[in-house]
Amino acid sequence: MNPTASSTYAAGDAAGYELQMGRWSRRLAPGFVDFTEIEAARRIIDVGCGTGHLSLALVRSPRVEHVTGIDLSTAYVEHARSRSDDSRLEFVVGDACRLPFPDGWFDHSASMLVLQFVPDADAAVREMRRVTRRGGTVAAATWDSRGGLVFLRVIVDTAAVVDPDADRLRAKLLSQPLTRPGDLRRCWGNAGLLDVTQDMLTVRMDFECFADFWAPCEGQEGPLAAYVGRLSTDGRTRLRALVQRAYLDGEPDGPRSYAATAWMVKGKVP
């Protein structure tokens, strides 16, 4: 799926997404669910469900009766469906900015690591509020791309030193919607949600070696892979060598663990 008016993320390879970001979504989801305090519900919607990590975390509670995950990417939805035979889970293809559900249909709505890729994120949040009943929770999480995503800075800061195109990519990635301090709180307030609370959650991104760290850049999923894929063979070889130096930081190749911090917000529908 190419970028659209509703998403700047080129999604199409579910396995590639799992390698690039899904494995970290899996780590983030339980803590985000704890933050939402959603423990019981007849119906919950996971907006921009991707490959299903948040939906799977939500149904860990036996008091959650049904979770609908919705995503623009057919490939992601099919992958999510394949991950569980839990009858409480449903995954459908659809647009976060035009949710195909009536007003107040869900008890709660949540979105994880998605809104930063929605050009009109305010519209998506308004839709989340619309389909959530009065008194229900609307919650979201986005990466702190500039100050809290070490793996990203290792790559884009290195690339930006030697390539103006990478410098422009860095500027784009570090200025995505709803990734700066206070952005989510302001957005939730503008949407008319009440009792708005913002917090942070940090997980660890653990890599076995540099090859594990670099592998997503050689794939086909996400903005980093797209950038690397446009480079010449010599350009890719040069960039890989430079990023490897940054990863090794003077020590032998092997495991590295980087912090990854997400902003989280929740509010109530009046």
Predicted regions and their residues:
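A short acidic, Gly/Pro-enriched loop at the edge of an enzyme's catalytic core
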Residues: 97-108
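Conserved catalytic/acceptor-binding region of the Class I
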Residues: 122, 129, 133-208
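Conserved Class I S-adenosyl-L-methionine
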Residues: 3-6, 10, 24, 51-53, ...
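A short SAM/SAH-binding and catalytic strip from SAM-dependent methyltransferases
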Residues: 107-121, 144
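Class I SAM-dependent methyltransferase SAM/SAH-binding core
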Residues: 43-99, 123
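Class I SAM-dependent methyltransferase Rossmann-like catalytic core
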Residues: 11-22
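A generic alpha-to-beta junction signature in SAM-dependent methyltransferases
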Residues: 36-38, 62, 84, 132
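Conserved alpha-helix/loop element of class I SAM-dependent methyltransferases that forms part
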Residues: 23-42, 57
